[in-house]
């Protein structure tokens, strides 16, 4: 029986039946993310080629995709504290997924909109990422609650792996539609089907999960819940500063896709398949770093700046083979960033402040993404200088991260065997 049990955050053994019950909500959120990522990540590799088709330059592509990522991250500073104050975590989660479900299929209209097509596409691309900003802090609080008993490193990694499975299936679906029709409009329109499926599953999950979510999430706001300053420990802020620098160096995939189709000679229909490969690499990176995090702590994140520094010399190389390798490195880096980083924040911050913490942290990442979009767009034609700039940014990120890891009172090894610290 011991082989069929696992340990909860309190350190007690969980029988197989209870294990399935504890993992059920985690898998449920993962399936919602799977369907939603078929939509969002199915469209994402076409952002650069679509904007280029509509007349955008490398600078415009960099700014639009950078602004989209900045919105996805930076606006969480608004929606994270808002979710904490109101405790309406489900409302924000539903609204955010709904915005993505609307914006992405409407990209089908952009090539048909004439001179307004570039503006329409830019607004919808950014709108999709605004939806992510609305839902992400609230959804992550819900996910942090349901992963507490199964180990946050593993829980977030399993959820992220399902999420990334959708990010693989979406581009494969888009590639198949492009191969069959040659039309980006048809490809975007097809994504209305998984969008509807994601919303159906989310409403179904809403009816079943409340009993699995700790009272701390659904309770009325405690006194002083509108004061996020309690999450601003020195270690947390240093960690966020490191995130600014690594985000500034992590190129948006729209720029990579622009490069692949305009410089490396890769057909547009192949780009979604390359993105699918990147998401497979991201899933492996998320799982590996999650397991290492649970066993060895936050030092697992030191690999992130090193991976990011390797992206531009590979992904923006003129040779397609090197560019393909760079896409895989890019995917691995995003997998670590999107899963293990969140697990650490959940362990650093009390439950009543996690929405605020995710929002504040994401604001640093968003500011970095916006700066990075401008950096890549303006230096795209001077790649040696771009490679040097990214290397310097990642050296700074690595150094600040090392200091942050010393400042943070190291979250205890084996987070799956501990409760949150209530600093």
Briefly describe each language-model feature range.
Residues 16-70, 236-267, 271-274:
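Helix-loop boundary and gating motifs at the non-cytosolic
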Residues 2-23, 207-242, 417-423:
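Juxtamembrane intracellular "pre-TM" segments in multi-pass secondary transporters
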């Amino acid at each position: 029986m011991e082989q069929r049990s696992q340990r909860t955050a309190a350190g007690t053994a969980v029988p197989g039946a209870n294990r399935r019950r504890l993992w059920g909500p985690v898998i449920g959120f993962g399936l919602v993310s799977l369907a939603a990522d078929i939509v969002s990540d199915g469209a994402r590799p076409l952002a650069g080629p679509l904007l280029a088709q509509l007349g955008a330059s490398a600078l415009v592509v960099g700014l639009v995709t950078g602004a989209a990522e900045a919105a996805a991250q930076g606006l969480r500073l608004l929606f994270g504290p808002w979710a904490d104050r109101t405790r309406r975590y489900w409302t924000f989660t539903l609204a955010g997924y709904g915005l993505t479900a609307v914006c992405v299929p409407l990209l089908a209209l952009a090539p048909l909109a004439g001179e307004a097509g570039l503006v329409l596409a830019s607004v919808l691309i950014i709108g999709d990422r605004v939806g992510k900003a609305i839902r992400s802090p609230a959804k992550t609080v819900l996910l942090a609650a349901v992963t507490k008993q199964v180990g946050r490193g593993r829980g977030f990694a399993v959820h992220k792996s399902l999420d990334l499975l959708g990010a693989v299936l979406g581009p494969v679906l888009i590639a198949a539609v492009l191969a069959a029709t040659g039309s980006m409009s048809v490809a975007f329109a097809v994504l209305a089907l998984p969008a509807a499926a994601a919303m159906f599953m989310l409403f179904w999950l809403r009816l079943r999960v409340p009993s699995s979510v700790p009272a701390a999430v659904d309770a009325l706001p405690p006194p002083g819940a509108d004061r996020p300053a309690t999450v601003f420990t020195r270690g947390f802020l240093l960690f966020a500063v490191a995130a600014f620098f690594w985000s500034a160096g992590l190129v948006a995939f729209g720029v990579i896709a622009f490069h692949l189709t305009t410089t490396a000679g890769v057909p547009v229909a192949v780009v979604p398949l390359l993105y699918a490969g990147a998401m497979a690499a991201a899933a492996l990176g998320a799982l590996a770093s999650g397991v290492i995090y649970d066993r060895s702590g936050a030092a697992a994140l030191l690999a992130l700046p090193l991976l990011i520094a390797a992206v531009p010399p590979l992904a923006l190389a003129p040779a397609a083979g090197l560019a393909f390798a760079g896409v895989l490195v890019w995917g691995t880096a995003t997998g670590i960033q999107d899963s293990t980083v969140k697990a650490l924040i959940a362990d650093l911050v009390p439950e009543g402040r996690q929405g605020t913490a995710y929002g504040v942290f994401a604001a640093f990442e968003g500011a970095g993404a916006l700066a990075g979009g401008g950096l890549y767009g303006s230096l795209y034609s001077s790649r040696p200088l771009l490679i040097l700039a990214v290397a310097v940014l990642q050296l700074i990120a690595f150094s600040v991260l090392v200091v942050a890891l010393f400042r943070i009172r190291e979250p205890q090894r084996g987070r799956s065997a501990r409760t949150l610290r209530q600093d």
